[in-house]
C-alpha cells in the first residue's frame, strides 16, 4: 500500500437518536444514526403495530362510505 494516500483511521463516537452512544473505529470522528441495536425492533423483540383498521374506518366515516 502506498503511504500518505489513505484517510486517517480514528476512534469514532456513534450517537443514536434514542440516546445510546458507543465507540468504534472509522475515518470520521463522529457519526449520528437514527436507529441502533439498542432501539431497533429486530434486536429488542418488540413490534410496532400499525392501526390500519382504525385508519380505514376514519376514511370511510370522513367520506360517508
From Swiss-Prot:
One of its GO terms (cellular component) is ribosome. One of its GO terms (biological process) is translation. Binds 1 zinc ion per subunit. Its cofactor is Zn(2+). Zn(2+) binds at residues 16, 18, 36, 39. PROSITE patterns: RIBOSOMAL_L31. Part of the 50S ribosomal subunit. Belongs to the bacterial ribosomal protein bL31 family. Type A subfamily. Binds the 23S rRNA. This is Large ribosomal subunit protein bL31. It comes from Campylobacter jejuni subsp. doylei (strain ATCC BAA-1458 / RM4099 / 269.97).
Amino acid at each position: 500500500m502506498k503511504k500518505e494516500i489513505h484517510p486517517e483511521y480514528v476512534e469514532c463516537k456513534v450517537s443514536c437518536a434514542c440516546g445510546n452512544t458507543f465507540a468504534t473505529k472509522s475515518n470520521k470522528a463522529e457519526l449520528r444514526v437514527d436507529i441502533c441495536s439498542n432501539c431497533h425492533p429486530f434486536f429488542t423483540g418488540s413490534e410496532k403495530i400499525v392501526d390500519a383498521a382504525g385508519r380505514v374506518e376514519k376514511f370511510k366515516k370522513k367520506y360517508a362510505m
